[in-house]
Amino acid sequence: MADEQTQDTQTPDANSAVGDELATRVQVLEEQLAAAQDQSLRVAADLQNVRRRAEQDVEKAHKFALEKFASDLLPIIDSLERGLELSNPDDENIRPMREGIELTLKMFQDTLKRYQLEAIDPVGGEPFNAEHHQAMAMQESHDLEPNSVLKVFQKGYQLNGRLLRPAMVVVSKAPAPVSPSIDEQA
């Protein structure tokens, strides 16, 4: 019987030690689980960010894949427009050729418009916009506000809102004040 009492007294201490050990083990496992779940969420978020970035890159590549090609076509459009400007619309000898150039230019412009290539062709008097215009010269003007477009040398173009070439323009400036002449000073 004495042996049974000894066993009974050892059992609560042993059970308590085993219980503490198990509680510690459970706590460690719960911490490891929380860390693994946190890491899993971070990896999932990183993966989602990588996917989104890749989709954006592909979208930009599709959107601006034509940029170089469109830039190479701009001098051709400029030449067709210049040819129309310099030809006399009343000359019967060149009328068929002029009509052919007009038709070709219109087809070019319609095709480029389908691919979101837009002309930047400021109207005289429009305020100068450094984002879309490049000032080639400044000229005094009594008729227009300072920093307005006086003349367009060359149209600009943008593709899907991105500038390919700025419009080359002459910008107005305020007239110089008239200095009094020697006769007026006397």
Curated annotation (Swiss-Prot):
Entry's HAMAP family?
A: GrpE (MF_01151)
Subunit-level organization? Homodimer.
By what name is this protein known? Protein GrpE
Sorted alphabetically, which Gene3D superfamilies does this protein's record hold? Answer: 3.90.20.20, Head domain of nucleotide exchange factor GrpE
What does UniProt give as GO cellular component? cytosol
* Record flagged with keyword Chaperone: yes
Task: Describe the function of this protein.
Answer: Participates actively in the response to hyperosmotic and heat shock by preventing the aggregation of stress-denatured proteins, in association with DnaK and GrpE. It is the nucleotide exchange factor for DnaK and may function as a thermosensor. Unfolded proteins bind initially to DnaJ; upon interaction with the DnaJ-bound protein, DnaK hydrolyzes its bound ATP, resulting in the formation of a stable complex. GrpE releases ADP from DnaK; ATP binding to DnaK triggers the release of the substrate protein, thus completing the reaction cycle.
Instruction: Output the PROSITE patterns linked to this UniProt entry.
Output: GRPE
Task: Report the main location listed first in the record.
Answer: cytoplasm
Q: Cite the Pfam families for this sequence.
A: GrpE
Stored InterPro entries: GrpE, GrpE_coiled_coil, GrpE_head
Query: What domain of life?
Result: Bacteria
